[in-house]
Amino acid sequence: MLSVQPDTKPKGCAGCNRKIKDRYLLKALDKYWHEDCLKCACCDCRLGEVGSTLYTKANLILCRRDYLRLFGVTGNCAACSKLIPAFEMVMRAKENVYHLDCFACQLCNQRFCVGDKFFLKNNMILCQTDYEEGLMKEGYAPQVR
């Protein structure tokens, strides 16, 4: 929630760490901001202007477009075909969107952790082992460097 409050004593800006000496200051995520410093965490657009709407989730401050892109209704999961609600975190691979629990190799069901390599082949998510085995069956072996 964005609130504009009259400034009683200088507070530090969460964006630039400088004192806020403006007549009004902005408060979001229980932190104070200069008007120019309150920005979307994804696209850096300014959110401190009168009439701007901001959204907060997972300790992020977001504009409407990025909030909906990250957390909005995303359609159906590419793995299970069930609807993904707006409040649920998702994983994406190109244009495909997945529930976190569904983001796994579609051959061996190995779940992926942050930083794991995965491959998208014929609209299927594959782990590195299954991807390379598929390439071997097709007669192509990736070069190891």
UniProtKB/Swiss-Prot annotation:
InterPro entries, A to Z: LMO_RBTN_TF (IPR050945), Znf_LIM (IPR001781)
GO CC entries: nucleus
GO biological process: positive regulation of transcription by RNA polymerase II
Keyword Metal-binding appears in the UniProt entry: yes
GO molecular function terms listed in the Swiss-Prot or TrEMBL record: DNA-binding transcription factor binding; metal ion binding; transcription coactivator activity
Pfam families: LIM (PF00412)
Keyword annotations of the record: LIM domain, Metal-binding, Repeat, Zinc
Domain of life: Eukaryota
Every LIM zinc-binding domain range: 11-73, 75-137
Name this polypeptide is given: LIM domain only protein 3
Species in which this protein is naturally found: Danio rerio (Zebrafish)
Highest classification ranks of the organism: Eukaryota, Metazoa, Chordata, Craniata, Vertebrata
Gene that produces this protein: lmo3
